[in-house]
Amino acid sequence: MVDEADPKGNPIGTELVYEDDSVRVWRIELAPGEMAGWHTHYLDYTTVVVEGDVVERPNADGTVDRIEVTPGAIMRWNQGTLRHALRNIGSKTFRNVIVEVKGRRTGAREAPAGA
């Protein structure tokens, strides 16, 4: 089992940019056609889309989710056990910021517009 305290063993993004006792902040940047590695979210997290148009999320169970993204969109997710990856299938570079919340379980929901 991967230790959630060690992000090197389960990288959520392409770069870990900040970490303290409360949060861990990742950046993802994927060129068109590029794929981020397989990982599992062991902490609740919030994503903020910076740039991009469409990505797909292949899941370990064989399903694939197509996700149209809008810059500025904010989504909150609960930790999960389904291993997945992320591939940029759009025509623009995909940039995303992920904030993992340590020690808190918020449940999945979309943030209200303007939040």
Describe the role of every protein-language-model region:
Residues 36-38, 56-57, 83-90:
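Short beta-strand His + acidic residue motifs that chelate non-heme Fe in jelly-roll/DSBH
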Residues 9-37, 44-47, 96-101:
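A short glycine-rich, His/Asp/Glu-containing loop-to-beta-strand
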Residues 61-80:
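Short acidic-glycine-tyrosine-enriched beta hairpin
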Residues 79-104:
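Ligand-binding loop in jelly-roll beta-barrel domains
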Residues 42-61:
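Glycine- and acidic-residue-biased ligand/ion/polar-headgroup-sensing regions
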Residues 1-12, 104-115:
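Basic/polar N-terminal segments that are highly enriched at the extreme N-terminus
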